[in-house]
Amino acid sequence: MKITFTPDEIAFIEARGSSVPEVEAQFTYFEKGFPFADLQRAATIGDGIKQMTAEEIAHYINVYEQKSKELEILKFVPASGAASRMFKELQTIVNEKGPIESEIVQKFRENIKNFAFYSNLRRSYEKSGNSWESDINSDKIINIIAHLLEETGLNYSNLPKALLQFHTYSNETRTALEEHFVEAARYARGKNDECKLHFTVSPQHLSGFQALAESKKAEYEERYNVRYQLSYSTQDPATDTLAATEENLPFHDNKGNLLFRPGGHGALIQNLNHLSADIVFVKNIDNVITENQISDTVTYKKALAGYLLWLQEKSFAYQEKCKKTQLTDDECLEIQHFAEEKLQIVFSSPNATQNEILAQLHRPIRICGMVKNEGEPGGGPFWVKSCDGSISCQII
């Protein structure tokens, strides 16, 4: 789709690391839609999914615990997500000044003491000269909700999820950021008892993010006898998408400037690509549970990592063999069988050449834990055909 931009707009687009043809391609997708994934079949146990026995889980946990002491292990946490969606319904109530009798307001009132932010909210609200006891049980509850969400109070609607009080314990509350400190200490501890955590954050919240992390770091290092190495990055603006009007024309803000919106989490692959580690655990900032429930998480994370290390060892050995010697037909079949059965690689021929095998093996290995499909929304594992005709197992 051809779009006319002014010279200043072209300079603005290029300064962000993008180009006019790339922006035009985005608008073509808006107009014509995106092609559907060519799903061949759902992945099932034995066909894309490996189901570990209890003995295998114990074995791979042991593999990981023995080898992790000599490895650089990184926890990669996409953390730029704002909390606005969590409070969308409440924000609508504040914006429209009601209705106070709505179900969401009643639920908020009934459950207010169960929220991790309750004490902070009440303290801040009363410090502002308000009466909590009278307002929580009257129409003035809307003022409490506004104090929770807006800049004059806790500003939760505009903060990233990482900075919210997330979980309540008997003697403390924790943010989602702190829960990632705990998780890292439990399963992402590498050599020299070092836990590397990398957070992707939005530029406007970077300073607040760093301030919270640094203020809590020493406390959790002492509590779990680890050393945290923290790093941060922001999403590359070149991956942003130009907003469009309903007429599929470039959207301009109230100052007349083009408005770009951040891409989805898939855009963070570039951030990940710039990091170096032997093993990388990937987990969203809000995908954490309380520490008293964490044992299953630790078990399966370690088992997955141990299985990854076993696959790596086999794959690396086969790659070295491919590089250094001329393989026999039987050796090629052995390696191809490993790639098909263990790495879910589909070859175009039942008798792949040595070079084809090496090309398929020479790539990162990703292990994804699967949960039983019980009708919940979200992606799932499928065998997918790409435009070039190749078939691979993907999360769709």
Model regions: which residues?
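Acidic, two-metal ion nucleic-acid-processing modules in DNA metabolism proteins
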Residues: P381
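Domain-scale recognition of functional cores that engage charged ligands
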Residues: I10-I13, L39-M86, Q91-E374, V384, ...
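N-terminal regions that are enriched for targeting/export leaders
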Residues: M1-I45
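Beta-strand/loop nucleic-acid-binding surfaces
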Residues: Q394-I396
